[in-house]
Amino acid sequence: MSKFSFFNYRINMRNSHATSLRFIKFNYSEFKNIRNFSSEKKRDPKLSLFLNNVSKILSEHKKDLHKAQEIIEREWLKLATPSTDVKSDITSTMYTKHRLIHDRAFDLLKLYKSNGNLNKISKSLKDYIVNEKFIFIAWSYLLASYSKSSLTNLDYRIGYSITRHIYTEYYKDEFMSFDDFSNYNKFDVGFFVKLGDIFINTFTSPLNPIFERVFENEIYSLKINKEYENEIMESLVISPKALPMVCPPLPWGHGIRGGNLINLTDTQDESLVVGSFHHRHKIAITDKLYNVINKLNAFKFKINGDLLSYLQNEGSFILDFYKNTKKDTYINNMITIDIARTYLNTPFYLNVNIDWRGRIYTQSFYLDYQGSELSLALINLFEGKKLDEKGLFFFYVYGANIYNDGGKFSKKSFQDRFNWVVENLDNIIAMDKEFILKAESPTLFAAFCLTMRKLKENPDYPVFNPIFLDATCSGVQHFAAMLLDLELGKYVNLINSGESVNDFYSQLIPAINKAINESAEKKFKNLKFSDISLNRSLLKKVIMTKSYNVTTYGITEQLKSKLEKVEKIVISKGKEIKVYDYLVPTKNGDFVVLDTFEVETLASIINDNIFNQFPKLHSIYDYLTRLAKIYLKLDIPLSWSTPDGLELTQRYNLSKVKKLTINFLGKNRTAVLRSWVNEKDSRREVQAIIPNIIHSLDASHLTMIIDSWDSYILPIHECFGTHPNDMYKLAEQVRECFILLYSKNDFLNKIDYKFRENLKDYKIEIVNKNGEDFVKIKGNKRYEYLPLPVLPQMGELNVEDIRDMGKYMIS
């Protein structure tokens, strides 16, 4: 028993909620003292035991980092293997030194078994689940995903992972597959959720309240108990998949596994393609895409040591600022800082994967260029360069971009942004606290300022910071080029002969607000809407995602995440439930208060009116959705080819929802479970066709750029990063590949041609009536005729003009 353990085994029978349960009898004063000790002590500057051991491995094998990476991965596998009695070196000190969080969680798990709380677990698992290593697995899942997953999803992932581990270690020789093992034992979604909930309970129990279960907006989730922040940082356990690699990842190829040196995946065979395995999407990966992934994986990075030191000393006010304004990200920020400290003197690589559409995602969780602002700011290119004239210019432009001063700079010319930095050099070098915190991205701007200090001291200083430029609503850029719509192309800066940046979002806002105001009397009889005036910050993401066919529900959720909330308690079925009203800005600078239903109504108005200025957008939406409906009606796979040769097939399986009551230790919780069946989800097939095609075109464009690029490139979907010296050429390459995408590849005509060829292959007859084509389908009693969608009329945009007039295509 641990020295500080406050468990004892004097079991006392108590009743709770009319259920006879066994509870532990413990010393509450001792418990309170331990809580106070944990919450009041200052942040220990030492790394967690886990990261300290990783650091030791890196130090001991700094001349052979391939060996270091292999040791880190193998030690993790030892930790995750249930049967071994050998302690993993990477966590050996965690077994021998005091570990409050893990000790308490494991003591609770043992207690649940001794009290009979695990009796309902399957016999196949019951004898194996009380294993300390599963506590570590659950803990690592919780740390990585608590802030972005529902409680039920966490339950499922942990329960599934632990079951998979037990199958691999004890039952793999008895069953052909994990699915056979699960089917034989009748392990369904509900079983995995209940098993996972037992392990999560070891971290939410009053005896180990590291996380708090909260119920908001009809969803259970977890929040960090702030009293235990220090203890959490001391108890970090992180899978190598969530960490950078210190040697080049293995190359991927046809039938060849790449990435980590060892297969670390516990749920399925490791694959380059990640995403939901509940559906049956397909991608035929080309040699070009494999080459692109391997090129990205080979880029070497290092920690921005100047920024790390600054944040831990005089710049700690930035982390305090995030702690006060974005409290839910504080722990992740602290973990990111500690990982950066661990890898400070070691070069590293960042694994990437793709989804079935070819979109590229970084695998590392806390330290990666697609992650948080802090994560991005701490990453430097391993190879620096002295800034040339264009490099200095774009470095200054980037500095203005990340300061942005309330969105002012994103609409200004590159020269105006450059001039702003020149005019504010004294403030930039001084790095005054108030000046830094006014930046839109304070951490990135601090990194910029620190480099500017170095450049002032030595103009020949080699710069290691990557810089980034963003596309202007890339989804609409693709539609404009696809439709050759000149007006739309101007709005999204494909064609721009001036020196100011066209702001697509601001162009749409007046019409959207007018529609909202007019709806107050005409349709919804809600006078609250008559004075509403939504601004750019509220509508930018809505407009951007509408080009990907976001639904009214999606718009509602986006608005709710942006609007200021007012909490209130309502009584529903005899229970108190926390709900929110929302403060919506008005024309006179005040607010109106809308409830959730009214926000949904507001979202509906926006959805119906958002693109009224651009009828051709409606025509392409109509064409693609009608195409999808015919594919579904004929039960033909919905597939298309991207311009760079990817063959993609979209297939969403239907999900069924049921409610499961989880009863553990006398407490009930209702979980909503989703299970998938091998039937097409017709609604989602139609709804998803537009975003999936656009995402695949984004991916195709990026693949073409990376394949033809010889320097660093850091892709963040529609955002492009590289060394400042290379940004001018990269911007040119972005335009050239976009022109190639749409000048030599008539995408819409090819989709239409393939659609008609598919009909022929499936012996579907096309008939013409009065100049209109119909698909002839044999029904139960008679033939049915479905009108074929007609391609939208093309406009007058010459995509070749983008080369010279698309300067602000990315800005």
From Swiss-Prot:
Signal peptide: none annotated. It is an enzyme of class 2 (transferase). Its main location: mitochondrion. It catalyses: RNA(n) + a ribonucleoside 5'-triphosphate = RNA(n+1) + diphosphate. The active site is at 470, 540, 718. Its EC number is 2.7.7.6. GO terms for cellular component: mitochondrial DNA-directed RNA polymerase complex. GO terms for molecular function: DNA binding; DNA-directed RNA polymerase activity. It is found in: Mitochondrion. The keyword Mitochondrion applies. One of its GO terms (biological process) is mitochondrial transcription. Keywords: DNA-directed RNA polymerase, Mitochondrion, Nucleotidyltransferase, Plasmid, Transcription, Transferase. Belongs to the phage and mitochondrial RNA polymerase family. DNA-dependent RNA polymerase catalyzes the transcription of DNA into RNA using the four ribonucleoside triphosphates as substrates. This is Probable DNA-directed RNA polymerase.
